[in-house]
Amino acid sequence: MLTFLIPTAKEMMIPKESHPHLLPQDSQAILKIMAAMTTEDLAKSYRIKEEAAKKEQQRWQDMASQQNLAYPAYQLFNGLMYRHIKRDKLTTQEQAYLTQQVYITSSFYGIIPANHPIAEHRHDFHTRIKIEGQSLKSYWRPCYNQFAKEHPQVISLLSSEFDDVFSKDCKQLWISPKFMAEKEGQFKTHSTISKKARGAFLTACMENNCQTVDSLKSLVFAGFYYHPDLSTDHEFVYIKKEA
């Protein structure tokens, strides 16, 4: 069985479905630090303006006082990749695939199933804090490595910020899809192409119930197709021709 890892997103949209917010033990140490930070501290940590930091401060304080709700993560996150993932009117098989084989890597919650209930928050591995004297990446590394040991065959749709959260020896069987546009024989990639394609790729995997590495090579989605000459055992390259 294939396991997919996808990143979080800064952009969020409140869905209809909500739950009480139950925070994992490992996250509580982070919450304690974030909730104690001033608006000025948060602005520096996030590298945002103080006006925007006020909103984030309120979210953390609401979370600390247990006054907020939680929502299925794949529905709450609404960044470009998430908007290109099929999230509504799923078949029973697609729903099972999404909730049992897709996991979200978070610097606040750890690695969680795609439908795990989470609260509105802003947090990533660039957030400048120390937990028990450790960086966020060092703090989460044992948890992330344990997940990797339990799920050796991972399809990683993660961005570069996660490269050194996992130890290298845990990623020997990982495959990272790469998405490129071809125009007049020139190949290019950028974040917009990649984010849209990640969502479309995951949707195609769900719809086709891909369970083997070889099945990924036959996928055609949003104009992309597998390119064997550019691919390696650990990097599957998908090309889309542009007019």
Swiss-Prot record:
One Pfam family it belongs to: H2O2_YaaD
Name of the featured protein: UPF0246 protein M28_Spy1772
GO annotations of cellular component type: cytosol
One BP term from GO: response to hydroperoxide
The family this protein is said to belong to: Belongs to the UPF0246 family.
Natural source organism: Streptococcus pyogenes serotype M28 (strain MGAS6180)
PANTHER family (UniProt xref): PEROXIDE STRESS RESISTANCE PROTEIN YAAA, PEROXIDE STRESS RESPONSE PROTEIN YAAA
Lineage: Bacteria, Bacillati, Bacillota, Bacilli, Lactobacillales
